[in-house]
Amino acid sequence: MRIRFRQISLLGILFSSAILMQSCGVLAWLGIVCADVARCSDVKFESFEHSWVAPPEERQVHLEHLAVAPFVGDIRMAEWWATVLSQATDRHVISPAEVSSRLPPNVLTQLTQSTTDQDDIALAPQLSRDIQVDGVLFGRVVGEPPQKAFWGLKERCPQRLFLHLVSAEGILLWKAELPFTVVKGKKEVDEEMAKRDLLTHITTHAKELGWTELGLVAVHTAS
């Protein structure tokens, strides 16, 4: 009887230990996951706002070749847009890096100082001539003060992208605003994932943005 009691006690101890070890394993796994999440950075795109398309009589242009100018305040975002536009439309898109390499220094300086759609309209004809394109997409990113997030381990940076598409003749064809938030951890943003998210965002809202009216037909959708 005493031996049986000892056996039962031993089994109880082993069972309790197994549960405790399993719990510790789960806690350790959760700790690793939380630590990794705390280090990661990401970008969240909100809904487009204040979209506008030129009336039919002003947008009778064929946008076969487009250039994406370096965005004021965020060069990387301009590169993302160039990549995504080449995937989302059937147009030939020239990247900001190539635009910069083909422009004289004084024009590049003007680009960095551009703050309004009128500045972009004034610059578009010269850029279009120098790069041989039918239109230029301009962008300007304005940010708000960063906020602490994830118990102070990350920074949350709300930002807004102002977009202007101007024809080679200096006609404003389309404009919109895209609010987005960058959450900064110790790791850099996964740019491929961010571009996939942006592609999905654009193709999902292409019609309501007025791209169909401009002849910018979406030819790819993100999976």
Could you say what each language-model-derived stretch is?
Residues L11-Q22:
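Bacterial N-terminal signal peptides
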Residues C24-L63, L127-I131, G143, E155-R160, ...:
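C-terminal/domain-edge helix-coil "capping" segments
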Residues H62-F138, L172-K175:
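N-terminal segment of the mature soluble domain
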Residues P146-W151:
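Extracytoplasmic/secreted cell-surface and envelope-processing proteins
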Residues L137-P145:
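Glycine- and acidic-rich phosphate- and metal-coordinating loops
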